[in-house]
Amino acid sequence: YLIVGVIVLAGAFFSNCENTEGFRIKNIFNSSSPSNKEETSKNISEDLQVHFVDVGKADFIYIKFKNHNIIIDAADKEPNNIVTEYLKKQDVSKIDLAVVSHAHRDHIGQMAEVIKSFSVEKFIMSKIPESLIPTGRTYEKMLRALKEKEVNSKIAKAGESFEIEDLKIEVLGPVKKGKNLNDTSLVLKMTYKNVSFLFTGDAEKAEESDIIDAGYNLKVDVLKVGHHGSRTSSSENFLKKVSPKFAVISVGPD
């Protein structure tokens, strides 16, 4: 597997199969003294990893927090089984939280297989307006798998939050009814101690504007850039509000 980024938060550590040495980006933390900074970094690095896995122009994010497992999206339909195989290589047997940012195939492509292959404790996605509900088999297979496995499923709404021990995940969007599937994307802010991430799915500029208008604190350390870096996302105002130290784009050759 080519891993776009494995952020092991002791700084931020990115590595891939072609460059096993990787490189370390320091100073992700702000602390009042070097000793506090060093201790905080050590504690967080032992607790939290965020894997941005290269699945082409699609999204698959695996989060390891202590002994808990979280996934956000599940790639496209191909390459076959890339998501389940990757999770098995990480010794995952149970998924505490599975998230679908929105129902496009390049985000839900292998979610049905994940649900069938692992014990999924909780599943969340956003509400899809009736006019935008997908009619393809991929979406139907995911819903069928959720029903067959009796997964605790929930429509997540802006303003809600989920906590796993002292890891907090806040739902910032969608704030309003999206006019297209991209603007139904769940936008999630994940915070652990003094480190934060923003996961944006394929949220476009309209949803970004709604989130800004809602008054959320968008400042984070790491941004998962919306819609694979497309010009339809990442408005200048949004990027100023987020002001990340690092950004990750999931993209493949066109």
For the regions a protein language model found, what residue spans apply to each?
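Non-globular, low-confidence helical/coil segments that flank catalytic cores
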Residues: 1-254
